[in-house]
Regions:
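Membrane-proximal, non-transmembrane interaction modules
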Residues: 1-85
């Protein structure tokens, strides 16, 4: 079962590709969101939160829960609203 954060990060990469920013194979999730944060500086904190949580889920294999999940979901909602404008 794929956690929502993985689906969201895939969506985020699609948005980046639409802007002409493909993700290099050697690029980490945090480097990628950092690149997006340079363009959308108003989303820097939210993007960094998403990158950190995505990395945690991807490499630990555990589901999110509690406060961390709530914070990441709120960040993802703000990012999605902004990028869909």
């Amino acid at each position: 079962n794929q956690p929502w954060i993985r689906r969201f990060f895939s969506w985020l990469m699609e948005q980046g590709e639409a802007l002409g920013w493909g993700r290099r194979p050697s690029e980490t999730a945090n480097e990628y969101v950092g690149k997006l944060a340079e363009k959308y500086d108003d989303l820097e904190v939210d993007l960094m939160t998403i990158g950190q949580v995505y990395t945690q889920v991807r490499y630990s294999g555990r589901e999110l829960g509690g406060e961390v999940e709530e914070k990441a979901q709120k960040s993802s909602e703000r990012v999605q609203r902004r990028l869909e404008q």
